[in-house]
Amino acid sequence: MMKHYIKGGNETKKGTKKQLPKPIIIIVNKVLPVIVLLVAGFFFIPYVSMNFQNNDVKGLNTKAEAVMFYNSICSHCQKVYPKIFWHNVLNFNNESKQIQTINVQNTNNKHYLADFAIQATPTFMKTTNINQRLVSTNSQQIKQFIQTRGH
């Protein structure tokens, strides 16, 4: 009895393991993890800042454009905080365009609720005119409020 082998059949050759092209290996091993970390950081960093910073504010920063009073467990605040965080990051070298953030959920900052009669969060307030306020999560309204001069 004679064995017949079909060319290109199921027989595998040892040592001829298929490998991805080198540029694809570099992308998968080096570039993709960096992209994943950057994307994760984009969402994670504001969350960390919202919950663990702004917990013991010594006073209003009168050089800042405005202040945002927020509560870290407030869903409306959670919606708007990342936008304010990245606004501050982009304006890190211009203190007059910063928006100071104060977490009024923290025991150390609860006095701001009474000091400035804060009734809802998030509340935006001009540092130059504490009577000029906005309670909103609408990006356009917030942007317009920030751009108006406090008198």
Locations of regions flagged by a protein language model:
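Short Fe-S-cluster ligation motifs
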Residues: V104-P122
